[in-house]
Amino acid sequence: SALKDDPSHTAEVLAAAVESGGYEGLFLDLAELSSAQKKDFTALAEALRAELGEDRLLYLMVEAPVWQGAAYNGYDYAALSEPADKLVVRVADYGDVSEDFPIAPLAPLEEVYYALAELADQVDSDCLSLLLTTTGSAWTDGRHTGQASAAEIEQLLSASQTKDYYTDRYACAYLT
């Protein structure tokens, strides 16, 4: 809905909320945008910079360019980096399995590398930040049963019956 309204009006409303809340800036996360929304998101980012002024921070979450899997093409990275203080790049979570067993980390290193390589010529590196998950993926009897938080993983690591494994093939750690 943030992209359906006039970008100036949306920016005005968001900047007023930042001001009245006494916040240092705004972190805007509009996930999985399509190519049809690219210009609208860029216009909103530019309007937000104008409304927030230079004394407030503007962080924009963007989906990473992908090597494999579904791509969300609603981000003009170069144009978005102009009004943004930071572009926070989200690498999609993956759940690759083989014979009902997870075989890849949630943020595969090759996807992280690809995304950063693609953005290197488009965005100043000082403007880029990378978002990686700190959760784990829980599996029971070959079925994905949910997520495990960082605190839950730490608790599992301290349990004497927990065994940890690492596979070089998939650059991924496992607990059983």
Per-segment meaning from a language model:
Residues 95, 114-141:
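Active-site region of glycoside hydrolase catalytic domains
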Residues 64-71, 108-112, 135-140, 146:
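Active-site glycine- and acidic-residue-rich loops that bind
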Residues 98-119, 174-176:
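Gly/Pro-rich active-site loop or hairpin
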Residues 1-108:
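Chitinase-like catalytic core of GlcNAc-active glycosidases
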Residues 77-83, 111-115, 151-165:
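Short alpha-helical interface patches
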Residues 33, 99, 103-107, 127, ...:
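A sequence-level detector of short, solvent-exposed, charge-rich linear segments
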Residues 1, 134-176:
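Glycan-binding loop/region signatures in secreted carbohydrate-active enzymes
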Residues 52-56, 121-128, 158-163:
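Structural alpha-beta junctions
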